[in-house]
Structure formats: C-alpha cells, structure tokens
Amino acid sequence: MTTEQKLQLAEIRTMIPEMRRVECIHFVGIGGAGMSGIAEVLLNEGYHISGSDVAENSVTVRLAEKGADIFFGHHASNVEKASVVVVSTAIDQANPEIVAAKENRIPVIRRAEMLAELMRYRHGIAVAGTHGKTTTTALTTQIYSEAGLDPTFVNGGLVKNAGTNARLGSSRFLIAEADESDASFLHLQPMVSIVTNIEADHMDTYGGDFEVLKQTFIDFLHNLPFYGQAVMCIDDDVVRELLPRVSRQVITYGFSDDADVRLINYRQEGQKSFFTVQRKDRTDLDIVLNIPGKHNALNATAAIAVATEEDVEDSAILSALLNFEGAGRRFDQLGEFETGNGHAMLVDDYGHHPTEVDVTIKAARAGWEDKRLVMIFQPHRYSRTRDLYDDFANVLDNVDVLIMLDVYSAGEKPIAGADGRALCRTIRARGKLDPIFVPTIDALPSVLANIIQNNDLVLTQGAGDVGKLAKQLASLELNIQAMKELG
C-alpha cells in the first residue's frame, strides 16, 4: 500500500464509527467463502477475530496467519470472549456456540448484517442475481482496482487477480456479493445494485412461491437511496418484467436492442471473448475479455455499466478485462492430463443450477470445438435436484461423456427419486447418452483413468466437494498412472 493509500485509508477510518462495545467478533463457520471474507476485512480494520469450523482449509490457515483465533469443532467455550457472534443460515440453531451466546446475552447476527455494517458508511456496490454474482463482483473489483480506486471487496469466491476473496481497501468503495439464498441481502443498503438475472432457486426460503422471490428482489432494489442506481440485465425475462416496478434510477444492459449499455458482435476464441459495448453518449468499447462464454460477457458488461457511471477511464476498463484472471472455480483451467498418447484438458466449475451448467457447456463447446467433453457432475442439494430434475436431465444430455456422482447433501435429508442414480436412469432412458454412475468420490480417479482419451476436455462440475477432487487430481500433475494408484 502506498503512502497516499495509507492516508486515504486513515481518512476513511475517521469517517467510519467503530462498532461500540465490540472487541471480539466470532464467526461460526469461518472457513466458508462468505464468512471468511467479512472476517478478513474486519481483522484488517483492527478487530479481534475468532472463528470455528469443522476442519482446516486454506482460508482458515490464512486467517490464522493474520492473527485470528481459529477453533476446530463447535464448543460453547469458543465464544467466551466474543462481543458478537456471526452465523450463516447454514448453521443449526442448536449449535453449542449459538446456544452459549444466547444464554450469555451475546448478540447473534447473520453474516449479511455484518456486511451491511461494513457497507453503512461506504459507497456500496452490491451484486445480486441467481447466477453470475461472484464473477461480476470480481470483474467490478478488477476494474476499480485497475483504475487506482483501491476498493474494499467481499466476494463469495476467489478474486484471482487479488489472490483472495476479500480485502480492505483505502477508498470509500465497497464491492460485495449479495446473497439471495436466505433473503439476507435485504440487510444491505448500497448505493449501486446489480441484478444479473432471476430464476427459481433456493425456493424453500420463499415458501415455494416465485412471486415472493421476485418481490424480494424489488425490496432489495428499494433499499437503494432515491439517488442510487440499479443496474439490471434486460436480457433476462424476469428482470425485464420487474423493471416497471422499480422506483429507482435504472440502467439496463444486455444484448437486447433496447439496452442502455448494449453488447454486440460477440465471438469466442479459446478462453477469450471478444465483443463491443455500446454506451449512450460515450465511445464504444472493443473488449477482449480473458474468460470464455456469452454469460461472462454479460457479467463484464454489468461491471462496465457501473464503472462508466463512476467515470472510470476507458483505458482502465479495457486493461482490467484483458488481464482478468477469473474467479475461483468459475471455468477454472487447472492443467492437463497425461493420457499416455497425448493430453486432456482439466476445467473445474462451481455451477450447480441447470442454467449455470448449460452456459458452461456452451462455453466449452465454443472455445474447444475439437475436444470430446467429459463431465463429472455432482448434484448439489436433494431439494434442488427434485425441483429442477427435468431441467438437469435436459442440460446434462448435451455432453459427450457423463460421469455422475451422488448428491452433495449440504445437510439435507435424502429425497426419494432426487439423486444421482435416478438422474442417470432418466438420462439413459432418453437414448442419447449412457451416464456412468460413481457412488463415491473416492472411486472416481480410477474410473476416470479408464475413460480419458487424448484431446478430451474434462469438466468437474458442482458446488460440493467435487472441486476438492479437481484440486487433488491437479496436485498429482494429472498423470493417468497416479490416478489409477489413487483409485
């Protein structure tokens, strides 16, 4: 950090009141992406941070190195020094740390409440939507950083250029991913809100009623001040439908002819995307984006729309997108397999909704037309598999080889007929593809070793622990013999 940035940070800190009577902030489930990001920013602001999780990971190691007290396992004693306890909705209310905190009258708050506190005295930019939040947050962060604006950011995944998912910046800007999964994004009061798209997901939160979900997004946008800005993707049918109900200033973006910020002339070559962005009363931008897919071009256009409103220099926008390294587990190219007679490419992707899987397949096809596409898919949550069963079957039918794992439950109880084996039967019955069901992830390396061919593109897909498998394979330098031995 430069001397000038240190002075700017000092000035910002004088404007932001410290949280009174708060000395130690404890995070239950601190190893998660969303929780760890907030914890890291608060740690850098000078608060004493502690946290617990079930196991060590790279995030807990980094936080411990920065001075946080990390506990493994959940025990009442972990919150003895806490002034406030931060939890996510994934944490059971019977957790002994939550119980102990309530018994001792220690405030227990949701992670979004703490994020809202960070945003309260800053120029907040909140990125919401069913898909694309993490990448759009990373893209916006990259542009603002390239422009020298040094934003604070809190993302749901790794911002590769920064090497972290959160950082305390020296400016007034805070860029954050806004989570609709538990409706907690309603706590946020940003200056700018992006909505990338709206689809039926996390419907248990909304009582299974899509109208409730749509109204919640409207309520989120109405948390903007009257002088705030909503940036909305007009290509999305639901977003377009909601536009007349938004009583805030709106900028639309997309491929559509009537978009305020319009994307045209898209093409993809390998991992790079090329397109032009047209802006009202501004010079057109010829973009080279260093990640593939039309969906990512849309994500970048959202970031461009926000940056343009802030009068960020075009040169910074162009440079940031050209040099953008991506977001963690978003079409993450991890290396190559040695197949014995050549090589196969390994890509890891977090997408776990049919729409996300579909755009990932399309990006792979567009950039690597000559490769056979081998997908290892791990369904995420029984409820999502049940609710979107036919959509999953339709999308997964579009790869060349499908290896299906069982559902990553994320704490849910099994639902009959909503598992990996059932999906395999449904897809097989259609006659186009013969999926291979692998009941345990430990058995996958040896299965994979017998399937991979020269020039394949192997895609690990899902939000569960399939990503850990991808890293494990990459750490073995993706050697076929090593995979056979691992299996």
UniProtKB/Swiss-Prot annotation:
Main EC class of this protein? ligase
Print the keywords alphabetically.
ATP-binding, Cell cycle, Cell division, Cell shape, Cell wall biogenesis/degradation, Cytoplasm, Ligase, Nucleotide-binding, Peptidoglycan synthesis
**Residues the entry annotates as binding ATP:** G129, T130, H131, G132, K133, T134, T135
- Could you say which EC number(s) this protein's record lists? 6.3.2.8
Question: Which Gene3D superfamilies is this protein grouped with?
Answer: Mur ligase, C-terminal domain, Mur-like, catalytic domain, NAD(P)-binding Rossmann-like Domain
Any single GO BP term: cell wall organization
Question: What cellular component terms from Gene Ontology apply here?
Answer: cytoplasm
**Cross-referenced SUPFAM superfamilies, in alphabetical order?**
MurCD N-terminal domain, MurD-like peptide ligases, catalytic domain, MurD-like peptide ligases, peptide-binding domain
Q: Which reaction does it catalyse?
A: UDP-N-acetyl-alpha-D-muramate + L-alanine + ATP = UDP-N-acetyl-alpha-D-muramoyl-L-alanine + ADP + phosphate + H(+)
GO: which molecular function terms? ATP binding; UDP-N-acetylmuramate-L-alanine ligase activity
Please give the pathway this protein is involved in.
Answer: Cell wall biogenesis; peptidoglycan biosynthesis
The cellular location(s) given in this protein's UniProt record come to: Cytoplasm
| PANTHER family assigned to the protein according to its UniProt record, in alphabetical order | UDP-N-ACETYLMURAMATE--L-ALANINE LIGASE, UDP-N-ACETYLMURAMATE--L-ALANINE LIGASE-RELATED
The record, for HAMAP family, names: MurC
Q: Briefly, what is this protein's role? A: Cell wall formation.
UniProt similarity note: Belongs to the MurCDEF family.
The name on file for this protein is: UDP-N-acetylmuramate--L-alanine ligase
- Write down the species: Aliivibrio salmonicida (strain LFI1238) (Vibrio salmonicida (strain LFI1238))
Q: Which gene encodes it?
A: murC
